[in-house]
A protein has these predicted regions:
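Short gly/ser-rich loop at a beta-strand->alpha-helix junction or flexible surface loop bordering the NTP-binding
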Residues: 1-92, 99, 103-131, 138-143, ...
Length: 158
């Protein structure tokens, strides 16, 4: 069937559909569509060395789940911050990097996601990404004035 996701993405698509059972496969437009984020988005883009599970999505309205491998966050995103990957809406790579930092992901894994996103040309404005990442430096344990972005890009080079 044309446009159907490959086997690789089937579990993510199933999780995506379970958030909004009335939505049909391929119905990615419209208000309230769940959006893959964090490690799930990175995995969909094929950046970094992260797995998709637990599946993490955001929706503009609060939703709950009893599935232990599914995280749903309440969050409104601008349509410019979302891309369609294998038929599934996902945060763009720059925002995925920021989300991974905000969620406390291991910085070596974040460095790999960042490096792959840059290498594949998936970051449209590296300067803006640097500002967003550096703004999170203190949270990530960086000394005052140090660049978290530079630290992450150096980690990959080592």
């Amino acid at each position: 069937m044309g446009g159907s996701p490959s086997t690789r993405e089937e579990d993510v698509l199933a999780a995506w559909l379970s958030i909004d059972p009335g939505r049909r496969p391929g119905d990615i437009a419209g208000e309230g569509a769940p959006i893959a984020m964090g490690a799930t988005a990175a995995w969909l883009f094929g950046i970094g060395e992260v797995g998709p599970s637990p599946y993490e999505f955001c929706t503009p309205e609060r939703k709950q789940t009893k599935r232990p491998n599914l995280i749903i966050r309440k969050r409104r995103l601008d349509s410019n911050d979302v891309a369609i990957v294998s038929g599934i809406p996902a945060t763009r790579p720059w925002l995925t990097v920021v989300d991974l930092i905000d969620s406390g992901e291991d910085l070596s894994l974040v460095a790999n996601v960042l490096a792959d996103a840059l290498e594949k040309g998936l970051v449209e404005d590296e300067g803006a990404l640097k500002k967003f990442v550096d703004a999170r430096g203190a949270k990530a344990g960086m000394p005052a004035g140090a660049s978290l972005y530079d630290s992450l890009t150096r980690r990959r080079e080592e």
